[in-house]
């Protein structure tokens, strides 16, 4: 198992996110706290995992996503903008053991 810390921030009205690990286990993120909202999870070690984000807000608003192994080792860092229709749907693959 690999311990991950997920941080999602930005200017959004609503957000939903999950991590799917290499064993196809889906872990919905219970994001808590202020910007950035944070969640700690365990995933099966393996070649990949996917972070899946759905959000809504004002067009052009930025959403940030950071995945850390432990508290400091960065596995993933992404910046997205909410689309013209007010929605954002993204899935990105990363190595949880990196």
What are these regions (language model features)?
Residues 1-20, 41-98:
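Beta-strand-rich recognition domains
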Residues 28-34:
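Short beta-strand segments within Ig-like beta-sandwich modules, predominantly Fibronectin type-III
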Residues 36-40:
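Short, surface-exposed beta-strand/beta-hairpin micro-motifs centered on an aromatic residue
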Residues 24-25:
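Short, glycine-anchored, charge-dense loop/turn motifs used at functional sites
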């Amino acid at each position: 198992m690999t311990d991950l810390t997920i941080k999602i921030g930005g200017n959004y009205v609503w957000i939903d996110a999950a991590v799917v690990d290499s064993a196809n286990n889906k872990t919905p993120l219970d994001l808590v706290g202020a910007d950035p909202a944070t969640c700690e999870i365990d995933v099966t070690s393996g070649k990949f995992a996917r972070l899946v984000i759905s959000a809504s807000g004002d067009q052009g608003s930025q959403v940030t996503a950071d995945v850390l192994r432990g508290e400091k080792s960065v596995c993933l860092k992404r910046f997205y903008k909410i689309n013209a229709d007010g929605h954002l749907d993204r899935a990105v693959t990363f190595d949880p053991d990196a």
